[in-house]
Amino acid sequence: MRSLIALLCYSSPVAATLHHLFVGAFRSPNLYAVGFDDQSLALTLLNNITTQDSHFWITLDHQKKNLYTTSVNSWSSYAIETPDSLLHRKTLAFEGSCTGSQAIFLESLPVSPYTVYGTTFGGDKSCGNVISIDDHGSLSHIIQSFDYGTGSGVHGLAIGSNNDILYSADDSGNSLWKHSINSETGQVEFLDRIAAPTSGSDPRHITIHPNGKFAYVIFEKTNKLALYSIDTETNTLTYTKSFPLVPLGYPNSEYWSDEVQLSHSTSYIWATSRSRRADYPGYISAFAISATGDILSQLFLTPTTTSGGMANAVARSPFGDEFVALTDSEKGFIQIWRFTGSSTEVVATLDLQDEGCCANAVWYD
């Protein structure tokens, strides 16, 4: 596995390619179009795009023709006109009886009917919205609203490998939820709620291996990456093991873990933690995984250059395993990190100090 990963990392393209990313902001009405040259390692701001609102989370549709975003009380969609320009198409106020909650996360179905799933966070419970799209992929209407019950606080969503299950990571409710997805309408129906293995684990984000046999879950409060096995017949989740996202002996109360993503080749997993104090760094880690998705080993646990603020959100590249993007909201920047075989290092930093940057990033190409 290590030799395969090293080969992937050290193989370089023949010619330089400019890759494009979009970056969201927590507190300012801006989206940022960024370019990364994979040979010169230059990271540049291509466009500072004024938007309808600040956007806490951004995600692309299956064709990369639309960008979907969250705001305090709404969902929005932007048409991608060029790799560095966006056109606002639609904003929908979130629906549901979730007082004090804010729109926090979106996930899009990659097959017909291409519905978009959103969840709110905060207040006394979370609400979920199922959103239809129009012929151009823009958000159209909220076709279903549901809630997760008192005490819930869902912060992350993932769609199963067969596109028939919606998994929800319930940070406040210390559990994972499972809903079936109707293949005709895209609407969901409750199936199960699975408690975390220990009190105060607080599942924050979740991602599913393409073969559908494993789920990777960030435990925000205990600062661990948890591995769940999935029964491919029943889709039942079973906790199996976990790995630390802060050094052993460090107090969990000083950290809050954040994001998890599979690499492009699915040969390893990236995960991050944030520090609650500006004078402590967050951490970035990678894990070698088997062909079936089981976690084999933790490759490294490396401090990030800042606490990460509310971000330290990792975004894997869509063109290879060598690079990932990392955003920071303490100082307001995006970085590109390179995997070197047994460790990782920063190769480019772009300051976007715009009184609100940066939330998460997505690679357009």
Language model regions located:
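An edge-strand/N-cap motif at the start of beta-rich repeat modules
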Residues: 16-42
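Blade-level signature of beta-propeller repeat domains, shared across WD40, Kelch, NHL, RCC1
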Residues: 329-335, 340, 345-365
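Hydrophobic beta-strand positions that form the internal "hydrophobic ladder"
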Residues: 21, 67, 116, 166, ...
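Short loop/turn segments immediately following the C-termini of beta-strands
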Residues: 26, 70-72, 119-123, 171-172, ...
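Short loop/turn segments immediately following beta-strands, especially the blade-tip
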Residues: 33-41, 77-86, 130-139, 179-187, ...
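Beta-rich, blade/repeat-based domains predominating
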Residues: 51-63, 95-112, 147-164, 196-214, ...
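Fungal secretory targeting signals
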Residues: 1-18
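Beta-propeller fold detector
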Residues: 43-50, 87-95, 138-147, 188-195, ...
